């Protein structure tokens, strides 16, 4: 027998145990950035919750002389509604796959689905992407109508903190910035800021950790994939002004009966019982609002407690022009000072009865009102061209 005979690794491969690390390497599931910063209200007890907000401020007048007449004033309130919208997903899994898996598939899928819910919430509320029809316009759209968008600039410091910068836009309406959301690429831009002598402004040492904050307001860099760099580079605002409430917390249910159907054609995709499958169903319902009450600096509620730094190529919007008149036939007149509310974004008509919005593609509901006239409601669809809308208000009787 040769002295160099041996059992090689190849010959014994079938008997060698392969070490399997009982862990799946993945990032910790991240939740909604917006829900971590905004103010949470008590859970909703129905699909819609009403918030009363100050709409008209009282005015004080000087009295002329000892026998002067004291003038009267008014104060009014408006209703802002939180409407619960539903997020849901179904994950079908064959039972054979569950039986053969080395990991708890259900335990791995659930946190990723919850992260996906957080991403959708942030996209809809902050960036107005895939927004439910019953929700108000997102923060970016509201800020845009208030003029709280700042063009991209090579002088990043001035664009954010200087006069007419992002922070100043918020402050002009009487709010103080208490939080900033930015793309992850903004970290490098801030670290690269230099003064006239070439010294770093944002961090003083390359070895120490950088404390990301602006004018005392902490910065957050969403890791759930929701931040849209094509719509904003940075968003700053008073997050205490934004509120949300939960109608149904994240509910996970495992189904082993029923069918999954294609809603477009009615075709059955999966029959759980017949195909030995289960389905993980996750449901979440919540509503949000930006009440934007009247303040001493914004009595008409035309402002927004948020502002943003636009990307080099601003997001595509179309002008939506409302012309508000009263009367009929040849006896018509422009209505100046009418409030046009498009999904929460408000503008006031000028002396020509005109209010011009800049809106991304989507469907909107407009409410036009003025004291002494009946309120009018219009539906608006924005696509790839400008939209004009003529509105005729009738005097209240």
Task: Explain the meaning of each model-derived region.
Residues 1-20, 40, 270-317, 397:
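Protruding loop/beta-arch "assembly-hinge" segments enriched in small, turn-prone residues
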Residues 2-89:
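Assembly/oligomerization interface modules of large self-assembling protein complexes
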Residues 45, 142-278, 284:
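Extended oligomerization regions of viral-like shell subunits
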Residues 81, 86-89, 93-172, 307-316:
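Alpha-helical scaffold segments that mediate packing/assembly in large oligomeric complexes
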Residues 318-320, 328-344:
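Short, ordered, surface-exposed loop/turn motifs in non-cytosolic proteins
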Residues 339, 344-355:
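Short, acidic Ser/Thr/Gly-rich low-complexity loop/linker segments typical of extracellular
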Residues 362-372:
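A short, solvent-exposed beta-strand micro-motif common in secreted/extracellular proteins
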Residues 371-396:
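Structured interaction patches on ligand/partner-binding surfaces of diverse proteins
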């Amino acid at each position: 027998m040769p002295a160099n005979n041996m059992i090689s690794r190849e010959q014994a491969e079938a008997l060698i145990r392969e070490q399997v690390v009982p862990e799946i390497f993945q990032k910790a599931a991240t939740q909604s950035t917006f829900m971590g910063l905004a103010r949470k209200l008590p859970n909703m007890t129905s699909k819609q919750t009403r918030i009363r907000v100050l709409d008209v401020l009282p005015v004080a007048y000087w009295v002329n002389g000892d026998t002067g007449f004291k003038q009267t004033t008014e104060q009014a309130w408006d209703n802002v509604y939180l409407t619960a919208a539903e997020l849901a997903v179904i994950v079908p899994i064959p039972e054979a796959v569950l039986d053969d898996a080395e990991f708890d598939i259900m335990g791995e899928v659930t946190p990723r689905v919850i992260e996906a819910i957080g991403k959708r919430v942030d996209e809809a509320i902050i960036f107005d992407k895939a927004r439910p029809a019953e929700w108000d316009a997102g923060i970016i759209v509201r800020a845009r109508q208030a003029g709280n968008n700042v063009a991209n600039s090579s002088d990043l410091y001035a664009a954010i903190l200087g006069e007419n910068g992002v922070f100043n836009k918020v402050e002009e309406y009487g709010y103080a910035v208490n939080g900033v959301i930015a793309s992850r690429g903004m970290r490098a831009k801030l670290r690269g800021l230099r003064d006239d002598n070439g010294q770093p402004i944002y961090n003083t040492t390359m070895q120490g950790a950088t404390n990301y904050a602006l004018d005392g307001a902490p910065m957050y860099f969403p890791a759930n994939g929701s931040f849209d760099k094509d719509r904003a580079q940075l968003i700053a605002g008073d997050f205490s002004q934004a509120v949300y409430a939960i109608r149904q917390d994240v509910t996970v249910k495992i189904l082993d009966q029923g069918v999954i159907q294609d809603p477009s054609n009615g075709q059955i995709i999966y029959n759980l019982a017949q195909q030995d499958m289960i389905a993980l169903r996750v449901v979440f319902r919540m509503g949000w609002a930006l009440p934007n009450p009247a303040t001493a600096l914004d009595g008409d509620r035309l402002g927004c407690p948020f502002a943003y730094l636009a990307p080099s190529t601003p997001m595509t919007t179309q002008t939506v022009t409302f012309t508000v008149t009263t009367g009929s036939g040849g006896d018509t007149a422009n209505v100046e000072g009418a409030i046009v509310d498009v999904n929460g974004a408000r503008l006031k008509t000028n002396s020509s009865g005109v209010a011009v919005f800049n809106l991304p593609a989507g469907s909107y509901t407009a409410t036009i009102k003025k004291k002494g006239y009946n309120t009018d409601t219009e539906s608006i669809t924005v696509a790839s061209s400008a939209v004009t809308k003529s509105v005729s208000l009738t005097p209240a009787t």
